[in-house]
């Protein structure tokens, strides 16, 4: 039987964040709604976003990096040539509040590494790690999801195009 001493020893060797703890305490609050498209930062939950976004294009016009495109009358985020700096200009101009400055400034995109990655080929390449402004990529290419905001700096920096954002 596990007693208090066991848990104290366990916790002295393992860090548990508040988010991680609450994820297990309140599992029913976890959203089961999956994204169907990559959305701009500061977007509402996918079900609300899909219902509220009217495809007006104000966010696309406001994006200084030209990363927001309209697909099927909905705003999508396309990080191909520049990262998202999470400036919030898209959220400031959204007339329907599908994007709003009070929503999380996270694109919810996370890097995926292909076999072309030099680190996976046992070569030295710290480019994605050093490019990440939040230091969310470890030397073993593990992503710290609590730090990562999906900006795409890692993808843009990768000169072998081994990173996709999903």
Swiss-Prot record:
Report if keyword Iron-sulfur is assigned: yes
Query: Binding residues for [4Fe-4S] cluster 1, per the UniProt record?
Result: 53, 56, 59, 94
Pfam families named among the record's database cross-references: Fer4, Fer4_7
Any idea which GO molecular function terms this record carries?
4 iron, 4 sulfur cluster binding; metal ion binding
Q: SUPFAM superfamilies recorded for this chain?
A: 4Fe-4S ferredoxins (SSF54862)
Kindly give the PROSITE patterns that the UniProt entry links to this protein.
4FE4S_FER_1, 4FE4S_FER_2
* Residues noted as binding [4Fe-4S] cluster 2 in the record, renumbered to the chain: 63, 84, 87, 90
Q: Which stretches make up the 4Fe-4S ferredoxin-type domain?
A: 44-73, 75-104, 139-166
Show the GO cellular component annotation of the record. cytoplasm
Q: Where are the transmembrane segments?
A: none
Keywords tagged on the record: 4Fe-4S, Iron, Iron-sulfur, Metal-binding, Repeat
Question: PANTHER family of this UniProt entry?
Answer: PHOTOSYSTEM I IRON-SULFUR CENTER, PHOTOSYSTEM I IRON-SULFUR CENTER-RELATED
Quote the NCBIfam families the UniProt record gives: napF
Supply the name of the protein.
Answer: Uncharacterized protein HI_1043
Q: Species name for this entry?
A: Haemophilus influenzae (strain ATCC 51907 / DSM 11121 / KW20 / Rd)
